[in-house]
Amino acid sequence: MKKPSLIFLTGFSTSGKSTIGPLLANSLGFEFIDIDKEIVDREQKSINEIFAEKGEPYFRELEYNVLSSISQSEDLVVALGGGTLENDKCFEFIRKAGTLVYLKSDVATLARRLSHKEDRPLMKGENGEKLSIEDISDRVEKLLAKREPRYSAAEILALTDKTPLGVTIENLTRQIERHIRANCKTN
């Protein structure tokens, strides 16, 4: 059964899921988990190590396992990985389980933020070299075009590139509280 107070944050890498998530959870009086952090804790390996040693399909299965373990939760904000929704099983689970919130940023903002992150696979070329901002922008644009249809399935949208963090949290809190009230009346 769909639980409107089980909140899933989606968006591209560096869109703000891990930053906004705990602040939003606190504002709502909810708990918070970050799927990537949960996987790292369970596996005792970094995301990059998991991808390198066991591959993406294994990682996507881990994501689904974490989602399944929280399926009965309420009053919880979950930061998804940037590519979680690419997994059909995860996407369908999330749509049926709770409320999807899309944290959207433009390509230039995402590329700029990514250029400051050393630990992201998107930052590296085929031989492990750091990419130029132009190459990062190209990658972001291609991946975003692929992921956008799933991101756009969200019930709530927040633009995170030009809005101050505090304003984003306030706006999202109001939108989510309205969404929960509206959906509690219909259930």
Curated annotation (Swiss-Prot):
Gene3D superfamilies attached to this UniProt entry: P-loop containing nucleotide triphosphate hydrolases
CDD domains: SK
Compartments, record wording: Cytoplasm
Molecular function per GO: ATP binding; magnesium ion binding; shikimate kinase activity
PROSITE patterns, alphabetized: SHIKIMATE_KINASE
Leader sequence segment: none
InterPro entries membership: P-loop_NTPase, Shikimate/glucono_kinase, Shikimate_kinase/TSH1, Shikimate_kinase_CS
Residues involved in ATP binding: T14, S15, G16, K17, S18, T19, R120
Pfam families (UniProt xref): SKI
Keyword flag DNA damage: no
Record-listed Mg(2+) binding positions: S18
Record's catalysed reaction(s): shikimate + ATP = 3-phosphoshikimate + ADP + H(+)
Main location (coarse class): cytoplasm
Pathway: Metabolic intermediate biosynthesis; chorismate biosynthesis; chorismate from D-erythrose 4-phosphate and phosphoenolpyruvate: step 5/7
Keywords: Amino-acid biosynthesis, Aromatic amino acid biosynthesis, ATP-binding, Cytoplasm, Kinase, Magnesium, Metal-binding, Nucleotide-binding, Transferase
Cofactor or coenzyme needed: Mg(2+)
UniProt keyword Oxidoreductase present: no
GO terms under biological process: amino acid biosynthetic process; aromatic amino acid family biosynthetic process; chorismate biosynthetic process
Role, per record: Catalyzes the specific phosphorylation of the 3-hydroxyl group of shikimic acid using ATP as a cosubstrate.
HAMAP family named among the record's database cross-references: Shikimate_kinase (MF_00109)
UniProt name for this protein: Shikimate kinase
Organism: Chloroherpeton thalassium (strain ATCC 35110 / GB-78)
Species lineage: Bacteria, Pseudomonadati, Chlorobiota, Chlorobiia, Chlorobiales
